[in-house]
Regions:
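Loop-to-helix entry region of an early transmembrane alpha helix in multi-pass inner-membrane enzymes
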Residues: 3-4, 86, 90, 100-119, ...
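Membrane-embedded helix bundles of polyisoprenyl
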Residues: 42, 134-171, 182-194, 219, ...
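Transmembrane signal-anchor helices characteristic of membrane glycosylation enzymes that use polyprenol
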Residues: 3-59, 144-146, 150, 221-235, ...
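Perimembrane helix-loop-helix junctions
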Residues: 197-221, 232, 333
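Aromatic/glycine/proline-enriched transmembrane-helix motif characteristic
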Residues: 14, 20-25, 127, 248-322
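Specific aromatic-rich, kink-prone transmembrane helix
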Residues: 119-123, 161-178, 337-338
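Extracytoplasmic catalytic/substrate-binding loops of multi-pass membrane glycan-assembly enzymes
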Residues: 50-64, 79-91, 252-262
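Transmembrane helical bundles and short interhelical boundary loops of multi-pass, membrane-embedded
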Residues: 1-11, 20, 41, 49, ...
Length: 410
């Protein structure tokens, strides 16, 4: 009975919160009605998935919540547990106090951030492209995007959480709220290491004079604020700071873990020097980031919001495409940003389609334990999308105009 009441309240809250978000967007009545229908469809898609348990839930999330339940809830934060950073563990500790099956609590959290992701994606699209259809298009597509739907409602993962915060950070930067932007970015990073794929974009925002260097100092401050409760509860600082290093050091026996990275092009069973290839991949990702930063530096006086968004998409696709040891969900930012980017022009639609198909291949492999298609196909799709976005940025920069080059302020 308690579970049924909780689910009814969850669905009602999802619809009410979504309606409030749409009201805040100030859409035309017809567009508002269409988005409301999408909201209902998004909930209908997710509802049957909420009872599904994946191996990640059974092997990690459920035991972690049970550990908190048996060891004093928040007091157990001080104990070494799992490979997630402490901000997400706060939620799991809170769930341990509630008389509801933790599976539904975990997925309820993901549903809330699915909605926030659609909201922030809509805001970003409206900020970059303007017009009356950018917001509803991004909002609707993101709510119904297969990898977004599956990530939270079926898989029970929280990638929409850090992605929503990252998009919020980018939107605030473009909206001339630099301090708030960096704070959101620091919070996003505290939840998920994969935020690092987009962090170089804030260097572009700095030399494009969208923020000042002193604003970047808020990044470690906001990160520290998220871990402060754990420190006060007695968790050693070293344990907290080592979480991401441990994540980066795991699974070195495989160059890709169902991710459509370039390493998926290596035939199964082929004898290769994995250490050498990993170093080459890391070097290539580093060169991509440095090359992009230098390229945009020469155009810094004429960079528009669209240029910055396009650069963000290049990072979201290119960095995990080149890095070794990537997992199936590590292209989540690419999934989301490609949709927002494509809202600006219908001819860009093939890019998010390619990204989504490639990313979905990794989901299919994990969730159904079989491949929908060879992961090498996904790698080719991601590579094609990356090349097209880079070419698009180059053509856009060549057509742009600007005045002089002025160094950014400190």
């Amino acid at each position: 009975m308690a579970l049924n009441i909780f689910l009814v309240l969850l669905f009602a809250a999802f619809l009410c919160l979504g309606t409030l978000v749409l009201v805040k967007a100030k859409l035309e009545p017809a567009v508002f009605g269409l988005c409301l229908a999408v909201l209902v469809a998004a909930l209908a898609l997710r509802a049957p998935m909420l009872s599904h348990q994946t191996y990640d839930y059974q092997d990690f999330l459920a035991p972690w919540v049970q550990f908190f339940r048996e060891n004093g809830g928040f007091l157990a934060i001080r104990q070494p547990l799992g490979d997630y950073n402490v901000p997400y563990l706060y939620f799991l500790a809170a769930f341990s106090y509630l008389p509801i099956a933790d599976l539904y609590l975990i997925k309820a959290l993901s549903l809330v951030f699915d909605l926030l992701l659609a909201f922030t994606g809509g805001r970003l699209a409206r900020r970059v492209f303007g017009g009356k259809y950018a917001y509803p298009a991004a909002f609707s597509i993101l709510l119904l995007l297969p990898t977004v739907v599956l990530n939270g409602a079926y898989w029970g993962q929280c990638d929409s959480l850090y992605a929503a915060l990252t998009l919020l950070a980018l939107t605030d930067a473009l909206d001339d709220h630099p301090a708030r932007s960096v704070v959101w970015l620091g919070i996003a990073f505290s939840f998920k290491l994969q935020t690092i794929f987009l962090i170089p974009l804030w260097c572009v925002l700095w030399y494009a004079k969208r923020l000042k260097f002193r604003h970047l100092c808020l990044f470690p401050v906001s990160y520290f604020a998220t871990i402060l409760p754990a420190l006060l509860l007695g968790k050693p600082l070293g344990d907290i700071l080592s979480v991401y290093f441990k994540q980066a050091g795991q699974y070195h026996d495989r160059l890709t873990l169902n991710a459509p990275s370039l390493f998926a092009l290596i035939p199964s069973g082929a004898e290769v020097d994995a250490d050498l290839l990993a170093k080459l991949g890391i070097g290539a990702a580093f060169l991509l980031v440095i090359g992009l930063l230098l390229w945009l530096f020469f155009y810094r006086s004429r960079l528009t919001d669209q240029h910055i968004l396009t650069a963000g998409l290049i990072l979201a696709i290119g960095v995990p495409l080149l890095l070794p040891y990537m997992h199936d969900r590590y292209f989540f930012l690419a999934d989301v940003l490609s949709v927002v980017w494509a809202v600006g022009a219908y001819r860009r639609a093939p890019i998010p389609v390619c990204v989504q198909i490639a990313s979905f291949g990794g989901y299919h492999a994990y969730l159904l334990l079989r491949y929908a298609f060879p992961m090498a196909w996904g790698a080719w799709l991601m590579l094609a999308a990356l090349v097209c976005v880079i070419v698009s940025l180059g053509l856009s920069l060549r057509k742009g105009t600007g005045q002089g080059n002025i160094l950014p302020e400190l």
